[in-house]
């Protein structure tokens, strides 16, 4: 389905990465998904990532949930990308910890595309100023694009306008003259199990899929 949606959006199937969201799933379930071909997995919580990390087979880990500055140092050498940067303060902490570890961390800026008070992420109008501030001051961070979680809707089609709006913001970033060593704007992380086909049609390059891979979560 992801591949068909990619073709509908005028792209090749390999242009879209399927990320397995492993929140509340066991190490065995995650390893089964890796055996079945999963290359990228996303965790929402730092503690959960750290508890599973030693026993999961080699894979590309992403942090997709809210990240507190005091937890950055715990994951800086374990993830390939942080999808949820929503402040200069957080970006600067990532920059500091990445510098200490001798690496450059890829990040996405999380946009609160529905302006929901209950969600983290920045407002659309703050995106360009924030990216300019980060690329101007953080040499161990590379901005790769944006991530959004649209307001919950009953039907996937309800998310389309939010995905289209996020894609426009992503394209605005691509037009900016940013330092090439600090920004490669190529990643649009949007779409989950319920609406990923619509997200891919609207240009997503990473879809975050949990229940469509693992079945319903085991809420303990």
PLM-predicted stretches and their roles:
Residues 204-220:
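Gly/Pro- and small hydrophobic-enriched strand-loop and loop-to-helix capping segments
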Residues 1-194, 200-202, 214-216:
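Conserved alpha/beta-domain cores
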């Amino acid at each position: 389905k992801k591949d068909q949606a990619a073709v509908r959006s005028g792209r090749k199937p390999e242009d879209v990465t399927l990320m397995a969201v492993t929140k509340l799933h066991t190490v065995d379930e995650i390893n089964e998904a890796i055996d079945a071909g999963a290359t990228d997995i996303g965790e929402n919580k730092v503690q959960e990532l750290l508890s599973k990390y030693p026993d999961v087979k080699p894979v590309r880990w992403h942090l997709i949930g809210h990240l507190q500055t005091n937890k950055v140092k715990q994951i800086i050498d374990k993830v390939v990308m942080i999808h949820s940067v929503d402040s200069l303060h957080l970006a600067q902490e990532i920059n500091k910890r990445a510098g200490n570890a001798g690496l450059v961390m890829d990040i996405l800026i999380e946009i609160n595309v529905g302006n929901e008070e209950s969600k983290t992420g920045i407002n659309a109008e703050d995106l360009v100023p924030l990216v300019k501030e980060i690329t101007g001051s953080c040499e161990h961070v590379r901005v790769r694009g944006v991530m959004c979680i649209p307001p919950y809707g009953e039907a996937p089609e309800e998310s389309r306008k939010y995905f289209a709006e996020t894609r426009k913001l992503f394209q605005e970033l691509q037009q900016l003259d940013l330092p090439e060593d600090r920004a490669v704007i190529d990643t649009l992380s949007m779409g989950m199990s319920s609406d990923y086909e619509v997200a891919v049609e609207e240009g997503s390059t990473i879809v975050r899929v949990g229940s469509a891979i693992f079945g319903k979560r085991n809420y303990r």
